[in-house]
């Protein structure tokens, strides 16, 4: 309870005393900020430049990660024949257009494609066997299934 009263009244008191208390001009904002940090003006300017450079690097890395994710999404859209997304394409273009997937994601996609190729190749091999007639196999399977149904109908237990 005391905290709530202090936070409500304290903020108003600070505003009131701040407007009444100081008739002094702050002058140059960088100079006062540099002095408050305990640095000279040159050190403060160098510090500000470093902050800006670090922010630009973080933004570039973030944009790169967003483009990698967009590349992955567009890959799956192509794979499953889904409609394209304009925001993904714009994110890829913002990152420079030529975005590579991270190794882990590329490895996962490669494993998926290998599995699909194996499945396709096994089916392809079955169809390409010279002594195998798929239509006769289908007929035999249907007759066997029909025989099983008839024997199940004749069973007295069921």
UniProtKB/Swiss-Prot annotation:
Biological process annotations from GO: insulin secretion; regulation of neurotransmitter secretion; regulation of synaptic vesicle fusion to presynaptic active zone membrane; synaptic vesicle exocytosis; visual perception
Pfam families, sorted: Synaphin
TM helices/strands, residue ranges: none
Keywords: Cell membrane, Coiled coil, Exocytosis, Lipoprotein, Membrane, Methylation, Neurotransmitter transport, Prenylation, Sensory transduction, Synapse, Transport, Vision
GO CC terms: cytosol; membrane; photoreceptor ribbon synapse; plasma membrane; presynaptic active zone membrane; synapse; synaptic vesicle membrane
Biased composition (Basic and acidic residues): 23-33
Highest rank taxon of the organism: Eukaryota
Main location: other
CDD domains: Complexin_NTD_CPLX_III_IV (cd22809)
A molecular-function term among this protein's GO annotations: SNARE binding
Tissue specificity of this protein: Present in many brain regions, including hippocampus and cerebellum (at protein level). Expressed in the retina (at protein level). Expressed in retinal amacrine cells (at protein level). Expressed in retinal photoreceptor ribbon synapses. Expressed in the retinal inner nuclear layer, at bipolar cells (at protein level). Expressed in cone photoreceptor synaptic terminals (at protein level).
Residue span(s) of the pro-peptide: 156-158
Subcellular location: Synapse; Cell membrane
Description of post-translational modifications: Farnesylation mediates presynaptic targeting.
Coiled coil location: 39-74
UniProt note: phenotype after gene disruption: Knockout mice are generally phenotypically normal, viable, and fertile. Normal overall retina structure and morphology of the outer plexiform layer (OPL) and inner plexiform layer (IPL). Abundance and distribution of synaptic proteins remain consistent. Reduced retinal synaptic transmission and inner retinal processing. Cplx3 and Cplx4 double knockout mice are generally phenotypically normal, viable, and fertile, however show disordered morphology of the OPL and vision perturbation when compared to single knockout mice.
Chain segments carrying region Disordered: 14-47
Residues where lipid is bound covalently (S-farnesyl cysteine): 155
UniProt record similarity statement: Belongs to the complexin/synaphin family.
Subunit (UniProt): Binds to the SNARE core complex containing SNAP25, VAMP2 and STX1A.
Task performed by this protein: Complexin that regulates SNARE protein complex-mediated synaptic vesicle fusion. Required for the maintenance of synaptic ultrastructure in the adult retina. Positively regulates synaptic transmission through synaptic vesicle availability and exocytosis of neurotransmitters at photoreceptor ribbon synapses in the retina. Suppresses tonic photoreceptor activity and baseline 'noise' by suppression of Ca(2+) vesicle tonic release and the facilitation of evoked synchronous and asynchronous Ca(2+) vesicle release.
This protein's name: Complexin-3
Taxonomic placement: Eukaryota, Metazoa, Chordata, Craniata, Vertebrata
């Amino acid at each position: 309870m005391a905290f709530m009263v202090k936070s409500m009244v304290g903020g108003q008191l600070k505003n009131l005393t701040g407007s009444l208390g100081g008739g002094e001009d702050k002058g140059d904002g960088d100079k006062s900020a540099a002095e408050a940090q305990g640095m000279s003006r040159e050190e403060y300017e160098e510090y500000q430049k470093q902050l800006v450079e670090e922010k630009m690097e973080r933004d570039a890395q973030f944009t790169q990660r967003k483009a990698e994710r967009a590349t992955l999404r567009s890959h799956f859209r192509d794979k499953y024949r889904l409609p394209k997304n304009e925001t993904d394409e714009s994110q890829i273009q913002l990152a420079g257009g030529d975005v590579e997937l991270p190794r882990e994601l590329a490895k996962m996609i490669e494993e998926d494609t290998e599995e699909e190729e194996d499945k396709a190749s096994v089916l392809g091999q079955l169809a390409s066997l010279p002594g195998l007639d798929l239509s006769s196999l289908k007929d035999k399977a249907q007759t066997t299934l029909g025989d099983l149904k008839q024997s199940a109908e004749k069973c007295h237990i069921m």
